[in-house]
Amino acid sequence: METDSMECVSSTGNEIHQNGNGHQSYQFSSTKTHGGAAAAAVVTNIVGPTATAPATSVYELLECPVCTYSMYPPIHQCHNGHTLCSTCKVRVHNRCPTCRQELGDIRCLALEKVAESLELPCKFYNLGCPEIFPYYSKLKHESLCNFRPYSCPYAGSECGIVGDIPFLVAHLRDDHKVDMHAGSTFNHRYVKSNPREVENATWMLTVFHCFGQYFCLHFEAFQLGMGPVYMAFLRFMGDEEDARSYSYSLEVGGSGRKLTWEGTPRSIRDSHRKVRDSNDGLIIQRNMALFFSGGDRKELKLRVTGKIWKEQHSPDSGLSIPNLSSS
């Protein structure tokens, strides 16, 4: 991590020096039950839309006792009828984790057929998802479900925290010590004493609250090809569909010149690396950055300003009219 100064300047002129912070790892508690041996049973019940949880006994039968995830074909079993998923069969070196007998290559076709007859709620039903799916279609939906938790947008580490937006905002503030601002305009300054040395991890993050939403402003320096570049971009703390309701602009300049960028913030559903690697933001090459810095061009002094606004659709003209008021 670079040790040079990275400063966040709020609209009111207060300066905050932000460096790399340590982080803590957390996990949500789970109340999952571990499945046992497969039972010889015919299951005909379908979980209806008013149910609050899957049929427990059936769900347990389809839960791998090793990884506790739902099992999908091929489902394996030992001679005593204990089942596990194909991934865990390799992990346990072909030995049943329940009775220690050799697994062989026996498939539990009966349990696979039972699964075909089931309809189950999305696993995010307790977060508000009302959808019911055939067992083998459920996994695909859950990977894209709008009610699934968001991943922590902090870019300086592999943080595994997930949760809803209010939880993540508190997590960023309290655990990652991220700078928080209210308002839709920003004024940031990035200062580096030796602009010829750049680590890929040199970056800063600020969270803005406006229009009742939260936005993450990223500013980073990283190596691209033979030289360093500096990039700024905005991410929306919510889904992509809602992100399209907002726009933002970024501007960097100096010595009578300026470079501007305007775009739509990306949802934090897209990973930080995905956004960065797509070049979807304001990108400043080192020579241009030094030109904007002025002076003898031996020290980098970049000031990035910008604003966020909400697009308002005009029913008469069909055009989008920017709303610059953050209240």
Swiss-Prot record:
A zinc finger (RING-type) spans 64-100. Residues 8-27 have a biased composition (Polar residues). Zn(2+) 2 binds at residues 152, 159, 171, 176. Pathway: Protein modification; protein ubiquitination. It is an enzyme of class 2 (transferase). It comes from the Eukaryota. GO terms for biological process: protein ubiquitination; ubiquitin-dependent protein catabolic process. Residues 1-27 are annotated as: Disordered. CDD domains: RING-HC_SIAHs, Sina. A zinc finger (SIAH-type) spans 117-177. It is found in: Endosome, Multivesicular body; Cytoplasmic vesicle, Autophagosome. Induction: Induced by drought stress, salt stress, osmotic shock and abscisic acid (ABA). It catalyses: S-ubiquitinyl-[E2 ubiquitin-conjugating enzyme]-L-cysteine + [acceptor protein]-L-lysine = [E2 ubiquitin-conjugating enzyme]-L-cysteine + N(6)-ubiquitinyl-[acceptor protein]-L-lysine. Residues 114-307 are annotated as: SBD. Its EC number is 2.3.2.27. E3 ubiquitin-protein ligase that mediates ubiquitination and subsequent proteasomal degradation of target proteins. E3 ubiquitin ligases accept ubiquitin from an E2 ubiquitin-conjugating enzyme in the form of a thioester and then directly transfers the ubiquitin to targeted substrates. It probably triggers the ubiquitin-mediated degradation of different substrates. Modulates directly the ubiquitination and proteasomal-dependent degradation of FREE1, a component of the ESCRT-I complex. Interacts with SINAT6. Interacts with WAV3. Interacts with FREE1. Interacts with ELC/VPS23A. The RING-type zinc finger domain is essential for ubiquitin ligase activity. The SBD domain (substrate-binding domain) mediates the homodimerization and the interaction with substrate proteins. It is related to the TRAF family. This is E3 ubiquitin-protein ligase SINAT4. It comes from Arabidopsis thaliana (Mouse-ear cress). The gene is SINAT4.
